[in-house]
């Protein structure tokens, strides 16, 4: 009876202050969020966030500065407009904006809810200096499509990231949601979805794609995979892409073996029209889904291969960092993040697996695998090869480290290749990077983080003293990796060979380019290896074509010349007029048979049986 009397008295007191909401304090109350995707005003969506009761006079509300998996400062608060806070009577409270992502609400004890409008990122990517990477961005296209990366729509109150969220989304009845969030409204109401998240991280970890229903589902070793496709011009259907995804993900599960994984996985594929649309192509991983953005204009063969390469990388993130990760990720601070030292693992291991599984499962040939690894070596040269990978990782949001982020996919892969070969060599083929991640996953899993500074020591204790030397020199330290040392263990080596090319391109790689800022002038590309035809005739990087065999060169006139060149006889005399440093030059020479020098990974001449055996277990498992 005393408790009842106490709550009655407190209720009367709160009502006298104008309160009409539950007296549950904010830290014990579910946060209720409403998104209105029907009444879209000027390409903006209205969001309301309704917490429990506060006692503090000052309340802080945040929209994320950055989110896990992006490793960049994106300031999603810049896309928030008309932010307001209301008391229990509906009157506005005083609000000040502290920075791009923080709002300070005074008289917090009277706070009922906040509301604001969200602008999307896709159609403004070309207008801003540092655009949000499209797979982590947002799209608002009234009645047609909504890409809800929820960190761009839903914010959080200081100290309340661990309380549950209920998301009520009013949407056009003709659009269907694809997401891994669980619905709570057992009795469906047309045009209304209600989702539950156990904490704020779960909100940000579960994007939602609203589009006209185009979903293909399939089962892979106990996982239900849903492929949802938004193709604005109807060029692609989920059903047409399903088979390749099934084959790829089946191979991934076979490669992973008994690693614990999700029961459901959603692939949200957004195909961009390019103009005033998403232009950052790739994907962003989540525990049970991934957002993929690719151009709709790609032909199906290239689109499917891009999906294989991108989605396989994202799916492998279920191993790391979604399972094996540090405290910095488990307790991620969305507005003052402390970054982990181990991007060599989170992104490097994942990208390595995304290539290794394809050779192990027979999706690509050995030659294709070597070409991919060689490509990583060449691409890694664009970055600082003496930069400590762990120092770069923990400072990845800052200069000069952030400009080297792309190297996590290049040298990060190569670090894992060298580590993998070393483990195979020291264990007579028994241990590998995959074995290592499985062991770490058994110990930690998604609920138990490791201590950032202890990981390398733990890996050494699980393996061999030589692994400590490797990390000290090549991951923590600044010593570049001698890749030949590791390739030689499996009977391979780096070398240069001559390969036949076309006169103007090798495969899909052209030796020429177009300067759109200079009337589409056609010029010789710089800083690439030119073929023997270009070299022999005297062409140099930066030369601007004026004519070929008397034909004035424009982008339009060059296309048929390239087509005709495939039939040129070797003794044909070719005359090319170019502009070089303001001077017109006439260059003449025979067509010949064009070849280009190519860096390759190739088999050594005197390979031992032991090296072949180690190569077999490395590449075939």
Q: How should each PLM-predicted stretch be described?
A:
Residues 15-16:
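C-terminal motif of bacterial Sec signal peptides marking the signal peptidase cleavage site
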Residues 52-88:
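N-terminal, post-signal-peptide region of Sec/Tat-exported proteins
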Residues 23-66, 147-152:
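Early extracytoplasmic/domain-onset interaction patches
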Residues 354-355, 363-621:
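C-terminal recognition in membrane/secretory proteostasis and scaffolding
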Residues 83, 252, 345-357, 576:
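An active-site-proximal "capping" alpha-helix that borders the catalytic cofactor pocket
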Residues 49, 214-342:
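Juxtacatalytic substrate-recognition/specificity segment
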């Amino acid at each position: 009876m005393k408790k009842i009397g106490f709550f009655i008295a407190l209720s009367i007191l709160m009502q006298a202050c104008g309160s009409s909401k539950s007296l549950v304090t904010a830290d014990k109350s579910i946060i209720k969020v409403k998104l209105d995707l029907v009444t879209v005003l000027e390409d903006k969506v209205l969001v309301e966030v309704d917490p429990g009761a506060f006692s503090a006079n000052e309340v802080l509300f945040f929209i994320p500065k950055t989110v896990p998996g992006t490793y960049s400062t994106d300031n999603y608060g810049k896309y928030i407009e008309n932010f307001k806070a209301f008391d229990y009577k509906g009157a506005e409270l005083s609000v000040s904006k502290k920075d791009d992502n923080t709002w300070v609400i005074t008289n917090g004890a009277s706070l009922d809810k906040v509301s604001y409008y969200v602008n999307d990122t896709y159609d403004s990517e070309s207008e801003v200096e540092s655009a949000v990477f499209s797979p982590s961005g947002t799209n608002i296209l009234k009645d047609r499509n909504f890409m809800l990366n929820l960190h761009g729509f839903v914010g959080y109150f200081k100290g309340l990231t661990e309380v549950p969220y209920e998301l009520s989304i009013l949407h056009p009845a003709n659009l269907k949601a694809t997401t891994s969030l669980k619905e709570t409204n057992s009795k469906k109401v047309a045009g209304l979805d209600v989702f539950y998240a156990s904490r704020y991280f779960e909100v940000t970890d579960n994007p939602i794609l609203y589009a006209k229903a185009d979903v293909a589902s399939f089962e892979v070793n106990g996982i239900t995979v849903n492929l949802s496709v938004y193709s604005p011009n109807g060029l692609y259907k989920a059903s047409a892409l399903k088979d390749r995804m099934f084959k790829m993900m089946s191979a991934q599960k076979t490669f992973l073996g008994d690693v614990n994984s999700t029961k459901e996985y959603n692939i949200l594929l957004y195909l961009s029209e390019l103009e005033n649309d998403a232009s950052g192509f790739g994907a962003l991983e989540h525990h049970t889904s991934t957002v993929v953005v690719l151009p709709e204009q790609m032909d199906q063969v290239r689109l499917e291969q891009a999906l294989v390469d991108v989605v396989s990388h994202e799916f492998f993130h279920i191993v790391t960092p979604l399972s094996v990760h540090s405290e910095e990720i488990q307790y991620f601070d969305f507005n003052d993040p402390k970054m982990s030292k181990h991007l060599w693992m989170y992104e490097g291991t994942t990208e390595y697996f995304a290539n290794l599984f394809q050779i192990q499962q027979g999706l690509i040939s050995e030659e294709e695998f070597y070409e991919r690894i060689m490509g990583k070596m060449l691409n890694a040269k664009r970055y600082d090869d003496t930069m400590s990978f762990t120092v770069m990782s923990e400072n990845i949001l800052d200069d000069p480290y952030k400009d080297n982020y792309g190297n996590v996919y290049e040298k990060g892969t190569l670090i894992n290749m060298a580590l993998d070969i070393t483990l195979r060599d020291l264990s007579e083929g028994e241990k590998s990077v995959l074995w290592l991640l499985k062991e770490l996953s058994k110990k930690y899993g998604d609920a138990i983080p490791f201590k950032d500074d202890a990981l390398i020591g733990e890996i050494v204790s699980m393996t061999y003293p030589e692994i400590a030397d490797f990390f000290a020199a090549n991951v923590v330290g600044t010593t570049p990796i001698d890749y030949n040392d590791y390739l030689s263990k499996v009977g391979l080596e780096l070398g240069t060979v001559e390969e036949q090319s076309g006169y103007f391109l090798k495969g899909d790689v052209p030796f020429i380019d177009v300067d759109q800022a200079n009337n589409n002038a056609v010029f010789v590309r710089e800083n690439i290896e030119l073929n023997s035809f270009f070299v022999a005739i005297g062409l140099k990087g930066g030369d601007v074509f004026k004519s070929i065999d008397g034909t004035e060169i424009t982008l339009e006139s060059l296309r048929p010349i390239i087509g005709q060149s495939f039939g040129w006889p070797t003794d044909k005399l070719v005359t090319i007029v170019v502009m070089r440093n303001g001077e017109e030059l006439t260059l003449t020479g025979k067509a010949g048979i064009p070849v280009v020098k190519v860096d390759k990974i190739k088999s050594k001449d005197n390979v031992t049986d032991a090296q072949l055996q180690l190569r077999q277990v490395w590449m075939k498992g």
